[in-house]
């Protein structure tokens, strides 16, 4: 049980800087920018873009272009050859890949700092929930591992062949915090089933998860929202029981798709019971925001990442957006300067935001129509 003062102190430290950043987002983002450009100045890319002379956000925008994955691919190729300083401020730890849900899978380098931020920010949704609910049994039980495999392809890096896989599985396998908050089954067991992601492959994974978890003290599930739902449907169909009949879960921590609260939550609750659905806005590139309370919005990690938004009236800081204002998100991480993540985001006021979806014509049109007919509700 995580009830000792020492445990509480550790948990509070995980969310403390996040909470503090929400009191003064402008100051938090100023500090984050300073740390980021200091790191970028150590790279060839950063030096080429005058990182050592950046004095503020206007300088940053003037010298660093907003870029997408395609523009950065030549720099990743240099890292692959062994020249990590071409783009990274510190040595490469591993490579990770996206799910490719919107096209070809992207393969990205990961450093120690990047992984540390993924682990720390990724834990905030759980820790914040436990602290605010006073429910530490959530952290004492098992969390269902419904992640993608971490061993999928091979890549030659600096003359050596390495294996890499999907980011969710890789992060789960490397996360030291999971020594205490345990995934069930272990990521190595998931990987042993192979790298496929067909329906049959997922059925084999779901069956492994079910066999390992049945009878165990499972307190939550965490991962890609459609996968969490597909797992529930699988065991209901094959074993005749819903998750709520097998486990007393405290919450579901859901990522990676839009409309989690409005489209998925009602269906998930039919299978898992009337429990909180906690949204996390995460991607291979970072864990950018998470739900802080019962309102159906996410709150940014201003202390770890820099957030800008390209709106119809120009590029603004995310925290500067007025309620109802929206646009294309640009993130800066410890690895990626001014990266066009490809998502649309909308402000709901008071550090609350809603991820609209991918930056695609149909989604933009849908949102324009939504605001036209229901904008008065925002």
Tell where the protein language model's regions lie, with residue ranges.
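AMP-binding/adenylate-forming catalytic core of the ANL superfamily
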Residues: 40, 321-378
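Short amphipathic alpha-helical segments
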Residues: 28, 32, 114, 369-377
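Active-site phosphate/ATP/adenylate-binding loop shared across adenylate-forming ligases
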Residues: 1-28, 34-50, 54-315
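Short amphipathic beta-strand/extended segments with alternating polar/hydrophobic composition
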Residues: 316-320
